[in-house]
Amino acid sequence: MIETDKLTPAVDRTNLDRVVAPQTKSAQEEALERALRPKRLADYTGQVKIREQLEIFIQAARNRSESLDHVLLFGPPGLGKTTLAHIVAAEMGVNLRQTSGPVLERAGDLAAILTNLEPHDVLFIDEIHRLSPVVEEILYPALEDFQIDIMIGEGPAARSVKLDLPPFTLVGATTRAGMLTNPLRDRFGIVARLEFYTAEELKSIVSRSASLLNAPIDPEGSFEIAKRSRGTPRIANRLLRRVRDYAEVKADGNITRQVADAALHMLDVDPAGLDIMDRKLLSAIIDKFGGGPVGVDNIAAAIGEARDTIEDVLEPYLIQQGYLQRTLRGRIATPAIYRHLGLAEPASAVVRDLLAEE
């Protein structure tokens, strides 16, 4: 059984408008993700080392009739942290209770969840880096000793009562592991970083999802979607659904490479997975600032986006792919993006390369 405490996230218009955004866009998309989500480790594609480790740790815990050690999953959004939490609970044969760091505002919120857990249950806390210090303090003894201290009464009559908890497994997920406090991080026995997926791994995911959606697709069509999915299963599944729509209306319903290419071209997703916002940022650096170096505030003014949006939403993938470089003097367009856009690299690039090395 799965119980979920809902959190309504702040609306990020830039992400809502981007088909290649790694964040979940709506409740409807969350429901579709759940339908496509693998239920067992045997069905989980990618993250080979993590999968192998979890298979061993879960089997060992089950053999000893113990709860699994607490698990911390971190990495960029859309890579399968929530999916793995659900799989851990399914493989252990226990219930999963799901909540989110920002939802747990008071110590009582966490205490209410912990005291209702059954032995060996899995508690999944998404965005665990956003736990308040007060809640985090309550969590420490719960993780170590399976006990919590709660205050009863107020003022001089207040007293502390220690409550025993059933053994349970906390699975924490975060996109910002660096924001976790050391005491909290140290209480996780299993720590795993999720990496971006290869195109071949995403091809398998697209093929599996297409089968579940009853969408006919050939291997070349799967690969065309996969290679534009920015290494992220969530994006791959979203693109698949949009390509399926295109195939049903503009073609015969079968997703071939040509159909996928035409659909993704319509969506402004190029062969490298860049969308119109990515190209807008890179074009501004190249056309308006000579390829850089240029400060992020100047870029923000040039393209009409907030600084935080550029740093948190647009830049990470461009930097990871080697199209953009951050230096002390500002952002620089790399030779790779000139090649991708079919532009001649200016002679000043040599000077910029020297600046980038400083």
UniProtKB/Swiss-Prot annotation:
Report keywords, A-Z.
ATP-binding, Cytoplasm, DNA damage, DNA recombination, DNA repair, DNA-binding, Hydrolase, Nucleotide-binding
Region Small ATPAse domain (RuvB-S), annotated ranges:
198-268
Q: Where DNA is bound, by residue?
A: 307, 326, 331
Give the top-rank taxon of the lineage listed in the UniProt record for this protein.
Answer: Bacteria
Reaction equation(s) it catalyzes: ATP + H2O = ADP + phosphate + H(+)
Under the subunit heading, UniProt states: Homohexamer. Forms an RuvA(8)-RuvB(12)-Holliday junction (HJ) complex. HJ DNA is sandwiched between 2 RuvA tetramers; dsDNA enters through RuvA and exits via RuvB. An RuvB hexamer assembles on each DNA strand where it exits the tetramer. Each RuvB hexamer is contacted by two RuvA subunits (via domain III) on 2 adjacent RuvB subunits; this complex drives branch migration. In the full resolvosome a probable DNA-RuvA(4)-RuvB(12)-RuvC(2) complex forms which resolves the HJ.
Free-text comment about domains? Has 3 domains, the large (RuvB-L) and small ATPase (RuvB-S) domains and the C-terminal head (RuvB-H) domain. The head domain binds DNA, while the ATPase domains jointly bind ATP, ADP or are empty depending on the state of the subunit in the translocation cycle. During a single DNA translocation step the structure of each domain remains the same, but their relative positions change.
UniProt function note: The RuvA-RuvB-RuvC complex processes Holliday junction (HJ) DNA during genetic recombination and DNA repair, while the RuvA-RuvB complex plays an important role in the rescue of blocked DNA replication forks via replication fork reversal (RFR). RuvA specifically binds to HJ cruciform DNA, conferring on it an open structure. The RuvB hexamer acts as an ATP-dependent pump, pulling dsDNA into and through the RuvAB complex. RuvB forms 2 homohexamers on either side of HJ DNA bound by 1 or 2 RuvA tetramers; 4 subunits per hexamer contact DNA at a time.
Protein's UniProt name: Holliday junction branch migration complex subunit RuvB
Species source reads Dechloromonas aromatica (strain RCB)
